[in-house]
Amino acid sequence: MSLDNHHPELAPSPPHIIGPSWQKTVDGDWHLPDPKMTLGWGVLKWLSEYVNTPGGHDDPNRLKVLISLSEAGLLENENMFIPTDEQVRLVLWWYAVDEKGQYVYREGVIRRLKGWGKDPFTAALCLAELCGPVAFSHFDETGQAIGKPRPAAWITVAAVSQDQTKNTFSLFPVMISKKLKTEYGLDVNRFIIYSAAGGRIEAATSSPASMEGNRPTFVVQNETQWWGQGPDGKANEGHAMAEVIEGNMTKVEGSRTLSICNAHIPGTETVAEKAYVEWQDVQSGKSVDTGMMYDALEAPADTPISEIPSEKENPDGFREGIEKLREGLLIARGDSTWLPIDDIIKSILSTKNSITESRRKFLNQVNAAEDSWLSPQEWNRCFADPDKYLDKMGFELAPLDRGQKITLGFDGSKSNDWTALVGCRVSDGLLFVIDIWDPQKYGGEVPREFVDAAVHSAFSRYDVVAFRADVKEFEAYVDSWGRTYKKKLKVNASPNNPVAFDMRGQQKRFAFDCERLEDAVLEGEVWHDGNPVLRQHVLNAKRHPTTYDAIAIRKVTKDSSKKIDAAVCAVLAFGARQDYLMSKKARTGRVVAVR
């Protein structure tokens, strides 16, 4: 499951771009698999020859392609299915293979906004899986991967309601060309299609038990944001279906699942949410990458809805807000140029539609649960994108260099939780991860000598002016750091100690610092480096009311596997920065203290 022979240097992706389809290289080109290491080109050629478009005959981009093909004498079917450029890239990645001819991706999730065209796209893939060259055959003399039809193809379109499968199956009679039906001997019925070679496409919405023992080669999991809990709030058998499908496909070599969905509702624990969490765990290093292609395109985090002022009270601000909303929608739609952006804007602005649902459906954004400390959009908005940084700050984003003034936050655990060391640059509030240790990667216990070395390395590289370290389970090390660096640190972590910050006795200060960091995030007065572990821990953090008239953070439950240790360190580092900036030892400069 690798592409070891193809490693272009990738450009940093903003947080609203997830997965390979919109990834670019540093040269500005699309990041694509090695042309010889994908079956996708053969699949695309087959689709153009055998599959019809379900609609969109007047689409300007489609007409442009048809005219070009006609002028080149290559047009065989004016009704041919023409994927968008975005869909072409998805096909190339989905059918990428490694040096053994095995698929790079074992499962996939395509998360897009409502109306993107997920059903026609997956219907086309189902037809290709039934009859097209989707299985690896061999490498030819040039090293090109060659595909072949899959023997005994068994494609399942699964959903938790029949209405969801209707969306896909209603497209097949239109998309199956006469040539496809004749050459492959298709017998097309309402909810099942047979091929003369013994293949089938079937719908599955019955009980999971009836699916047990099937041997599918390709499964489309439709609308997985409702698998587990439907739009009516009622529980369904989505999780049981997903488990049966996983068991069925595991016993068939080369079998894969592709889930299509809109953004899920956090906290509903649907199949879509579980896939999202799994992808985050892989990105943060918590889980092993078993070959998941998670591909999502969201509107940027600063796309406004509730932030748009009243047209009557502030007409200029209203126009600017609408234009910013339009820009966000144009990004989220990708290449789905047929979407009626003006109508979508009107729907979003209608007070009868909830803002969270509009963000979920049309901006494709995952909203925060009600008790979340920060939302994904709020955190993503503070990502230190160089262009955005320059526009806001008036000067370019400086790299993290030796000798820069920083503060440190440390939270340690011997074996239960993670241990983290996070820095905060004094000049601009840039939060960055120095190192994180998961005890499970070290035999169940954090290597304390590694942690100690990382702290000393940070002091040798940077001008550390303040350091807050929770003492629990690291008392001896914290005392040692205090003795070693007390003359270098400009402010103490607690009244009588330069480094020790005992969370058990500093709950009030910690709670107020949680609020200060939250305010800084909301006001855009802090930045972060986009570290996936820090992001996940921040989003895992839940609001915790205290008796001090301040909101602290905590895990969802004491024994939860959703860690927040890096988020705690970010609060400690940011709080240390605030202490330094408000001290007499801080020099004046381009800095902002959040009080």
Curated annotation (Swiss-Prot):
It comes from the Viruses. Belongs to the phage terminase family. This is Gene 13 protein.
